A protein has these predicted regions:
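Active-site core segments that coordinate phosphate-bearing ligands/cofactors
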Residues: 2-169, 177-217
């Protein structure tokens, strides 16, 4: 390969990866059971596992990373479901009023439109967002609680399918900065939070190259 592209013979050539896998590596997650959730328009999960998981009916696939496997899945819940009911200004106003120590008990399944892929695979799956309380703060909190419950169910589903059980969580995406929501999520997940080393995929690519030339981490 070096000869083909006119590179010096002593140049190390290492394999690359996808941007999603690189972002996971950038987080610092390195042990089976380490999970990274991206709270964006949708809810995306990646979990480092000692064994691979392939479940096409849920859109679950696994990438090999060294002697471990990175299993991933995505739910249609997430920021799009929140944005359907609240503007950015309303979210900013309501967030300080959240009370994660007192759950609403409304058991929502927030979706912007019918259809779910993971942890439930049903293209006709209906959102569950009623009854709607008169207080917007309670409604907003119930939506966040619902997304947290879906996240916990999704990691549980990965374990049911053979992946390592979730042991710690790191978070990326716009929702990561919401401290009250983080508290709801940690309560639902039952695992400790870890700070990410970086959210930049380029850092993960550099770490992969570093390991590729013989370094442990």
């Amino acid at each position: 390969m070096a000869e083909r592209y006119g590179l010096p013979a002593d140049v190390a050539l290492v394999a690359g990866t996808t941007d999603g896998c690189a972002a996971f590596l950038a987080s610092g997650a390195s042990s089976p059971g380490d999970g990274v959730t991206s709270l964006g328009t949708t809810l995306t999960l990646k979990l480092l596992s000692a064994t691979p998981v392939f479940a096409p009916q849920f859109g679950i696939y696994s990438h090999r990373i060294g002697d471990q496997w990175l299993a991933g899945g995505a739910s249609n819940t997430g920021g799009a479901a929140i944005a359907k009911y609240f503007s950015r200004d309303e979210i900013a106003r309501l967030t300080p009023l959240l009370d994660p120590d007192h759950p609403t008990g409304l058991d929502y399944y927030p979706l912007a439109s019918p259809g779910e892929r993971f942890p439930v695979n049903d293209p006709a799956f209906a959102p569950r967002l009623s009854p709607r309380p008169a207080d917007d703060r309670v409604f907003f909190q119930a939506i966040l609680e619902g997304i947290a419950a879906i996240e916990a169910k999704a990691y549980g589903r990965l374990a049911e399918l053979g992946a390592s059980r979730l042991a710690s969580i790191r978070t990326a995406g716009g929702g990561a900065a919401n401290a009250a929501w983080a508290k709801m999520r940690l309560k639902a997940l039952g695992v400790p939070a870890r700070d990410s080393l970086s959210e930049h995929a380029a850092v993960g690519t550099a770490r992969l190259a570093w390991r590729g030339i013989g370094h442990a981490n």
